[in-house]
Amino acid sequence: GADINPLWLGEEPSPKLHNINAERDLPELMLIRLAFNRQLPILGICRGAQALAVALGGKIQQDIYDEYIREEETVEKKLSKDKTVITYRAATLKHSQDAERCEATHSVTLNKSSVLYALYKEERLMVNSFHHQAVKDAGKHFRVTALSPDGVIEAIESSEFKPIMGVQWHPEWMGEEGGKLFQWLVGQSNNFYLAKQLHQRILTLDTHCDTPMFFPQGVN
């Protein structure tokens, strides 16, 4: 899809910015916020993962081949001992492949405490790649759960245990392996449906409700 307009983030456009689509940006960002507030399960793919971050307080990198990936190096000879110098570097892998969409072209490493790891039971996945932008800062509502070997954020998940996930690759082209993510989404959607049916019949009074939603009785 088109790049997300950096003006949504209070940034001026980089010379490397591609086409933008204002008619798409606004409804997507609004829908994400509405779905988030209603606890709806969400799976963001590629631009969708970036839109999740932007809509909920995170940031994206306009072009991953500019220096933005943070590194910390301890320099003992040039500086006083244990003083830390923060440096930044650019992505080094090819993230916009020329290979067919069904071909995996680089790996990602999964956080072992993530939903992704629970689904795949592997610490390393091979994925396809079609992007020049990526999540830069996941924000307070998400945590980073997958990285490429060069440090680009490849997946984010809710830090609040909501059924929300974003992946930078395109699982819809990855056959059976990609299908696991859609099975997860269907399963979470079914759980939401069952919870909603329950709350239509039973009014739950709880100071910590895991499935807050809009009730037909008029209770929000």
What are these regions, as identified by a protein language model?
Residues I20-L40, Y65, I69-F192:
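Amide-donor transfer/coupling interface in amidating biosynthetic enzymes
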Residues C46, H131, H170, H208-D210:
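Histidine-centered divalent metal-coordination motifs
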Residues I4-E23:
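Glycine/threonine-rich flexible loop motifs
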Residues R33-Q61:
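Catalytic nucleophile loop
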Residues F192-N220:
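N-terminal hydrophobic targeting/anchoring segments and the immediately downstream early-domain regions
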Residues G1-W8, K59-V75:
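Short, solvent-exposed beta-strand-terminating loops
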Residues N5-L9, L52-A55, I156, P216:
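Short glycine-/acidic-enriched loop or helix-start segments at secondary-structure transitions
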Residues A2-N5, A49, T211-M213:
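Glycine-rich nucleotide phosphate-binding loop and flanking beta-alpha elements
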